[in-house]
């Protein structure tokens, strides 16, 4: 049976990571791959939805002359419009990526890549997020200035993806992070989220009118607990596969109820 795949990202519709993943999925599987992605860079937007402004869909050509749909909104907007306007049905899979830079730790809640995957799951699709480690942080938002090799990562993702085609999907979203030097022989490790992937730093600068402005920045955390996604990617150089759920309720809800229900 032909798979229906909605392919989205947060780096924008002309990202080479998106194109590489589309080409591998289209050529290696019996699948209709529909690309619906943001017109502009949307990194760090999380799962935001555009409630207060209209959205436009523009049919466009990718660099390989294939067709895609550019949306003037967020990655989650792309999922909603992709399902309800372009496809007019829920696809088998929503796949978000390949992102330029890894998405690790609990900070995934800020990721547009993960936001789109969660949105896809929310509407009933099986969902993957795929990200490629980029150790040169200054290149993460300058893809056009320095070529980043995505084909290897796309083929590694294929190896992971095909394992879940003939089995019940185990979670809401599978978060796949791929080391920048990964090959098809790189071990795949099932991981949990680390606490943090970056330190938090605020840099103050002064504009020509002597007013302060700020950049939120940070530095990669290298030391995390073994078994976490950060440790797998940055220390062991393994492919990290983290099963995620939309339900963020505390795990020990019964204990919480026992302790606090008498207070209300």
Swiss-Prot record:
Organism: Methanococcus vannielii (strain ATCC 35089 / DSM 1224 / JCM 13029 / OCM 148 / SB)
GO molecular function: 5'-nucleotidase activity; metal ion binding; nucleotide binding
Residues that coordinate or bind a divalent metal cation: 10-11, 43, 99
Subcellular location: Cytoplasm
Keyword tRNA-binding: no
Record-level GO cellular component terms: cytoplasm
Function according to Swiss-Prot or TrEMBL: Nucleotidase that shows phosphatase activity on nucleoside 5'-monophosphates.
Superkingdom classification of source: Archaea
Keywords: Cytoplasm, Hydrolase, Metal-binding, Nucleotide-binding
One Pfam assignment: SurE
Disulfide bonds: none
Reaction(s) catalysed by this chain's protein: a ribonucleoside 5'-phosphate + H2O = a ribonucleoside + phosphate
PANTHER family: 5'-NUCLEOTIDASE SURE, PHOSPHATASE, PUTATIVE (AFU_ORTHOLOGUE AFUA_4G01070)-RELATED
InterPro entries: SurE (IPR030048), SurE-like_Pase/nucleotidase (IPR002828), SurE-like_sf (IPR036523)
Family the entry assigns: Belongs to the SurE nucleotidase family.
UniProt key word Transcription regulation: no
Cofactor: a divalent metal cation
EC identifiers of the protein: 3.1.3.5
Protein name stated in the entry: 5'-nucleotidase SurE
Manner of cofactor binding, per the entry note: Binds 1 divalent metal cation per subunit.
């Amino acid at each position: 049976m032909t798979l229906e795949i909605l392919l989205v990202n947060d780096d924008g519709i002309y990202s080479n990571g998106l194109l590489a993943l589309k080409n591998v999925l289209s050529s290696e599987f019996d699948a209709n791959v529909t690309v619906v992605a943001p017109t502009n860079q949307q990194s760090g937007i999380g799962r935001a939805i555009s409630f207060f402004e209209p959205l436009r869909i523009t049919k466009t050509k990718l660099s390989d002359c294939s067709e895609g749909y550019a949306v003037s909104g967020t990655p989650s907007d792309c999922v909603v419009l992709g399902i309800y306007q372009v496809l007019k049905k829920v696809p088998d899979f929503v796949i978000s990526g390949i992102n330029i830079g890894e998405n690790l730790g609990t900070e995934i809640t800020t990721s547009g890549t993960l936001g789109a995957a969660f949105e896809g799951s929310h509407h009933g699709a099986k969902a993957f997020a795929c990200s490629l480690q980029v150790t040169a942080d200054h290149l993460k938002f300058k893809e056009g200035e320095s070529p980043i090799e995505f084909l290897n990562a796309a083929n590694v993702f294929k190896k992971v993806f095909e394992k879940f085609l003939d089995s019940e999907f185990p979670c809401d979203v599978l978060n796949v992070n791929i080391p920048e030097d990964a090959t098809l022989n790189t071990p795949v490790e099932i991981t949990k989220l680390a606490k943090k992937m970056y330190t938090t730093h605020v840099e103050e600068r002064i504009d020509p009118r002597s007013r302060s402005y700020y950049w939120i920045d940070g530095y990669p955390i290298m030391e995390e607990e073994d078994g976490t996604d950060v440790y797998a990617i940055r220390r062991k150089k393994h492919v990290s596969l983290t099963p995620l759920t939309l339900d963020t309720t505390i795990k020990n809800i019964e204990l919480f109820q026992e302790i606090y229900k008498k207070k209300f």
